[in-house]
Amino acid sequence: HTDVNNLINSLSKPRTILLMVPSGKATKDVIEKIKDLLDEGDLVIDGGNSFYLDSEENGLALEQKKIKFMGMGVSGGEEGARNGPAIMVGYKNKISEDLKNTLSAISAKTDQDCIGFYEGYGSGHFIKMVHNGIEYAEMQLIAEIYEILRRSKKTNEEIANFFDNLKEENRSSYLIEITSKILRQKKDEVYVLDEIKPFASNKGTGKLTVETSLNLKVPTPSIYAAYDARVQSNNKNDWEEINIESEVTSEIDLSNCLYFGRVASMIQGLELIAKHMVNIDFGIVLNNWMGGCIIRSNLLKELNVVSSASKDFLGDLKL
């Protein structure tokens, strides 16, 4: 279909419309364009990377016309598209079993479906936003470990071996595993990584996580530092003048720094979720992220064990 009217009219009622368009104005424009073409009881699912407050606003706008809405966060990238992503669903109206089954079938699989259902139009996108903030933090931790090893004159192969060894220690993650592959990638016998300028842009979710944490008065220093590092990387005058060699005294210390830095980042993200979503079941969130998504790792399994056995999950993690 090339005409929206024809597309809407071709669907059987009650209609289900899944939007996968850029967040912000584009999503709002599409919803505004189709809402008068829809009928009471139809459902709009926003599967984009929308800010959670936008999802709440869009849901309320459609609610006035008695049209249902779900804000659905999706994580997984290209691999998720092929093998199933982690899906974070925010809802207010009751979800039919058929739709639950369809979304669950699409989602990534571990020993269960990597999908979570959270009450509130913006809740699914809130969980996805925090996921992205944690992702920023872990990527920055990996970058800083790389920086230390590089300045201690380790080769790309040696650094890749360091990250590979974390898998044997059950301290690896999807991001760590692909870092090893990136470090070894060559083109015309030259390491690709060595040809890349150290600039890092962002899509806005890291910034939104930081702003939300400030608004909710929840400290997220690891996530903030990661976002700040991206901003600073675009200031050419800063990074060009830095040229300091270092010496690694213990790779065990670096392994511990990376591991506990990741634990701290995860705790910060979960505390932000807890502040916004009272009585949240962390087991659902951790299982939701266990497969398909960018931050999947053994750490999530470890935290899930603690969560299932603890009455004060976050408190116990801080001990």
Where are these regions (language model features)?
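Conserved N-terminal Rossmann-fold NAD(P) cofactor-binding segment
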Residues: H1-L38, E57-I67
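Rossmann-fold dinucleotide-binding core
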Residues: T27-I31, L43-I45, F51-A160, E169-E195, ...
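Metal- and O2-centered redox machinery and metal/ROS homeostasis
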Residues: E56, D194-A200, S308-D312, D316
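Short, surface-exposed loop/turn motifs that are enriched in glycine and acidic residues
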Residues: E135, S255-V263, N288-C293
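Beta-strand segments within the central parallel beta-sheet cores of soluble alpha/beta enzyme folds
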Residues: E158-N165, I223-D228, F282-I284
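Small-residue-rich helix-loop
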Residues: N165-L166, N170, M277-A309
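A conserved active-site cap/scaffold subdomain adjacent to cofactor or substrate pockets
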Residues: Y191-V263
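Long, amphipathic alpha-helical stalk/connector segments used for oligomerization, subunit docking
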Residues: L272-K275
